[in-house]
From Swiss-Prot:
Gene3D superfamilies xrefs: 3.40.1370.10
Endpoints of the signal sequence: none
Record GO biological process: determination of adult lifespan; translation
Species name: Caenorhabditis elegans
One Gene Ontology cellular component annotation held by this UniProt entry: cytosolic large ribosomal subunit
Keyword Membrane on entry: no
Name the record gives this protein: Large ribosomal subunit protein uL4
Length: 345
């Protein structure tokens, strides 16, 4: 949770202006990585396309079992002769050239219904995590020279039309190092995805969130790793790619001011666009547990420790505890040694 009450607005030349904006209440949302990971996985499933294997795959042979009495398995075998293929097993999922086990069907349950309250909570938590520099650096963003997080810039950025204007802005705001990280991370994908129109993979850079439909999307879209979104249509898969918190966000001034209107405050039902929604409050106002248990209020309510406590007497079984048996009957050790000697004779 960001602790600063005010956020400075920077112009397109990355110079601090006189205007300051109060930090929206959504940045005080409790950070729930478990919820964000789960909801991101559910939302990602809704983008899947139904696919299946051919119903004839692995079954296009003339094969029949040889039956019993041949000292071979009763799996169907290819008919004929004159080739290595004849006599080989067919059809079964354990056979070369056979069908797969449990072939994929198009009527699989591909999509998931996502709880809207959990989805809003996850988006709010992802926004709150974007205001913590430690989480941004843990995710791999290069923000060593960034003056302030969350980073808010003037609305002149929304009027950018050319990519070269966006590049100049990113260089001035010391964010180009994060873009160079994206360039250097481009590599070949492992697996068969290379054959399916996704040969390369690379890291992600910052995401630009604007307030009104502007032309800045055309300026930033051709820069590798940079995403652009409208503040009224935020996508959890871009705020927390892979379900991981800590995406670097560049807010425009108008978008930053709309957050209280969209996501509300700590007052119940304060959101104007999301019915019945307000910013979730943390269960513990102070998460420093050691400070709580050492506070005067808690110490006064707790009984002082006893100086000479009377411990209850523990009754032990001497038949199972040999040391206790020897205390009660010292001669038992002699009897035990004598019995062992008799056994050896």
């Amino acid at each position: 949770m960001a602790a600063r009450p005010l956020v400075t607005v920077y112009d397109e030349k990355y110079e601090a202006t006189q205007s300051q904006i109060r930090l929206p209440a959504v940045f005080r949302t409790p950070i729930r990585p478990d919820l964000v990971s789960f909801i991101a996985d559910q939302v990602r499933r809704n983008r899947r396309q139904a696919h299946a294997v051919n119903t004839k795959a692995g079954k296009q042979h003339s094969a029949e079992s040889w039956g019993t009495g041949r000292a071979v398995a009763r799996i169907p075998r290819v008919r004929g002769g004159g080739t290595h293929r004849s006599g080989q097993g067919a059809f079964g999922n354990m056979c070369r050239g056979g069908h797969m086990f449990a072939p994929l069907k198009v009527f699989r349950r591909w999509h998931r219904n996502v709880n809207i309250a959990q989805k809003r909570y996850a988006v709010s938590s992802a926004i709150a995590a974007s205001g913590i520099p430690a989480l941004l650096q843990a995710r791999g963003h290069v923000i060593d020279q960034v003056a302030e997080v969350p980073l808010v810039v003037s609305d002149k950025v929304e009027s950018f039309r050319k990519t070269k204007e966006a590049v100049v802005f990113l260089r001035r705001s010391h964010l180009w190092a994060d873009i160079e990280k994206v360039y250097n991370s481009k590599r070949n994908r492992a697996g068969k995805g290379k054959l399916r129109n996704r040969q390369h993979k690379q890291k992600l850079g910052p995401v630009v969130i604007y307030g009104q439909d502007a032309e800045c999307a055309r300026a930033f879209r051709n820069i590798p790793g940079v995403d652009v979104m409208n503040v009224e249509r935020l996508n959890l898969l871009k705020l927390a790619p892979g379900g991981h918190l800590g995406r670097l966000i560049i807010w425009t001034e108008s978008a930053f001011k709309k957050l209280d209107t969209i996501y509300g405050t700590t007052v119940a039902n304060s959101s104007q666009l999301k019915k019945g929604w307000s910013v979730p409050l943390p269960i513990m106002a102070n998460s420093d547990f050691s400070r709580i248990i050492r506070s005067e209020e808690v110490v006064k309510a707790i009984r002082a420790p006893k100086k000479n406590p009377v411990l209850p007497k523990v009754h032990r079984n001497p038949l199972k505890k040999r040391t206790l048996l020897y205390k009660l009957n010292p001669y038992a050790s002699i009897l035990r040694k004598a019995s062992k000697a008799n056994v050896k004779k």
